[in-house]
Regions:
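Conserved ATP-binding subdomain of kinase catalytic cores across diverse folds
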Residues: 1-168, 216, 222-314
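Active-site micro-motifs of SAM-dependent methyltransferase domains
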Residues: 193, 221, 257, 261, ...
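Hydrophobic core residues within well-ordered beta-strands of beta-rich domains
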Residues: 47, 208-210
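ATP/Mg2+ or Mg2+-diphosphate-binding catalytic cores
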Residues: 283-309, 319-357
């Protein structure tokens, strides 16, 4: 892989790939095989990275779209009554054998088994990323005032930017998206307050180096298993910001937003073949999403705690997850309003569910 964008610093993809392969022997990422770096005025600049080829059947995004399409086809094939599907509260953990039979009958078992495997691999990645006590670039660290100032400055700037974007693009929206956009604007003070309510003194968990841009497109499907790749971090962030240690739950939040997108993308791309009202499809999608999240969290939390990864207790986990999902959905909103306004309903729906309006 030759990097198109060159930074006056080591590329995080090189740094993390090498660390996971050589230091932590983490198997579920393409193994680091070499790199081309240039020493320039004391800086180490990464030009290229070589990794082992992982045999695969495409990425997890493509895989999820196919599986979820089958789940929505089942609404008709199995004459499912959407309103009667048992609901699960968002972020409530659930074991696969406790999922109601009506949900298994509709969505099948395979989807939840794959979600469980992905949760396990994600936890193992985080345990590896936070498992070194000698290399200061990777040593876990606590929350502090400096991190909090950095975080709030970034988020409030981004939030203000998105407010301006939504106000300038309301004319592109209609139906549910327009309704949710107005609610977003009505709730802007509460959302801003939510971002400012980050009190590091109450947090007992640790920050580590994370993937930073974790979504289904960054995961390769290998049979029944998954490999994680592309550790470059969030494209909009500076190289310095990408190396800041963050809550591992930020990656989990990114993946949950990707689950949400996969469900809504399936609806938008195939809605003419599903004989249901759009609102009914959205309702079924939200139910499916909550069960996927519940299964993922049950496995992820259990594995993380077994591996001594300090992600905090339940209340802290819920706070960080909501905080990071809100951050991610606000980030997505700007992209959708500028690129494909029809899809703005996806992040707007995500924001509404976190803020509970």
């Amino acid at each position: 892989k030759f990097f198109r964008r060159i930074y006056v610093s080591t590329n995080p993809d090189y740094e993390i790939s090498r660390f996971l392969t050589e230091r932590m022997k983490f198997k579920y990422t393409p193994a680091y095989k070499g790199s081309i770096n240039v020493e320039l005025a004391g800086d180490n600049i990464t030009l290229a990275l070589m990794q082992e080829l992982v045999p695969n059947q495409g990425d997890a995004w493509k895989y999820m779209l196919e599986v979820i399409d089958g789940v929505f086809d089942n609404l008709t094939a199995k004459k499912i009554k959407v309103a009667k599907l048992p609901h699960l509260e968002l972020f409530k953990t659930i074991k696969i054998n406790n999922i109601p039979p009506e949900i298994i009958d509709w969505a099948g078992l395979t989807l939840f088994l794959r979600v469980r495997t992905l949760a396990q691999r994600t936890a193992e990645m985080h345990i590896a990323l936070g498992g070194d006590t000698t290399d200061t670039a990777f040593t876990p660290t606590t929350y502090n005032g400096d991190y909090t100032v950095w975080l709030k400055n970034r988020l409030i700037y981004q939030f203000q930017n998105r407010l301006n974007t939504i106000e300038n693009n309301l004319h592109k929206l209609d139906g549910l998206a327009l309704e949710l956009a107005h609610q977003f604007l009505d709730k802007k003070k509460e959302i801003r307050k939510h971002f400012l309510d980050f009190d590091w003194t109450k947090l007992k968990s640790e920050r580590i180096r994370i993937h930073g841009d974790y979504h289904l497109g960054q995961v390769l499907v290998n049979g029944d298993d998954f490999y994680i790749l592309d550790f470059e971090g969030e494209p909009e962030s500076t190289i310095r910001d990408r190396k800041v240690k963050q809550p591992p739950l930020k990656d989990v939040a990114g993946l949950f937003r990707s689950f949400h997108y996969a469900i809504y993308a399936t609806i938008f791309n195939n809605k003419d073949k599903y004989p249901f009202e759009l609102e009914e499809l959205f309702s079924a999608g939200e139910t499916l999403f909550n069960y996927m999240v519940g299964v993922f969290l049950d496995t992820y939390i259990e594995k993380a705690q077994e591996g001594n990864l300090n992600i905090g207790y339940n209340k802290e986990i819920a706070f960080l997850l909501k905080y990071c999902i809100l951050e991610k959905a606000v980030y997505e909103l700007g992209y959708e309003l500028n690129s494909r306004p029809r899809w703005a309903v996806i992040p707007l729906r995500g924001i509404a569910s976190i803020m509970e309006y």
